[in-house]
């Protein structure tokens, strides 16, 4: 298993994972599946030189999950805040992969002053 920075060619697999959650769970609030074009635009926000980063986990060329940090809210009071997300393919659940993705993501974004705070609702 490899964890690496997300690449443009990962967008189709990421879209498939997102769409599973849209279509089969209440984890996302979208009612219509994402398009490849929509996710390509979404992908453009990530860079390994900013606090907005994307990591993917692959095994034997198959993308099993991803974790990312994104803008939290588009208001200046939250400029120093990021929202972090992890999604896994169904066959990758329960194997510690989400924790490994989060560990890599948190390690990388700390260099940009991001700290981890947990909010429970």
Model-derived regions: residue spans:
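Glycine-rich phosphate-binding loop
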Residues: 92, 96
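Acetyl-CoA-dependent GNAT
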Residues: 8, 33-91, 102-103, 107-108, ...
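A short beta-loop-alpha structural element at the N-terminal edge
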Residues: 2-14
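Conserved beta-strand positions that form and line the central face of beta-propeller blades
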Residues: 2-5, 28, 56
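Short, solvent-exposed beta-strand edge segments and adjacent coil->beta transition regions
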Residues: 1, 26, 81-83, 114-116
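Conserved small/polar residues in nucleotide/adenosyl-binding loops
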Residues: 117-121
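Conserved GNAT-fold acetyl-CoA-binding loop/helix
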Residues: 15, 19-43
């Amino acid at each position: 298993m490899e964890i690496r920075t997300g690449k443009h060619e990962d967008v189709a697999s990421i879209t498939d994972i997102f769409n599973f959650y849209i279509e089969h769970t209440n984890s996302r609030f979208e009612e219509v599946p994402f398009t490849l074009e929509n996710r390509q635009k979404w992908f453009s926000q990530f860079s390994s030189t900013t606090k907005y980063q994307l990591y993917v986990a692959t095994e034997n060329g198959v993308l099993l999950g991803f974790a990312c940090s994104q803008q939290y809210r588009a208001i200046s009071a939250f400029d120093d805040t990021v929202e972090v997300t992890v999604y896994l393919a169904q066959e990758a659940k329960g194997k510690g992969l989400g924790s490994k993705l989060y560990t890599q993501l948190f390690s990388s974004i700390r260099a940009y002053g991001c700290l981890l705070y947990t909010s429970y609702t």
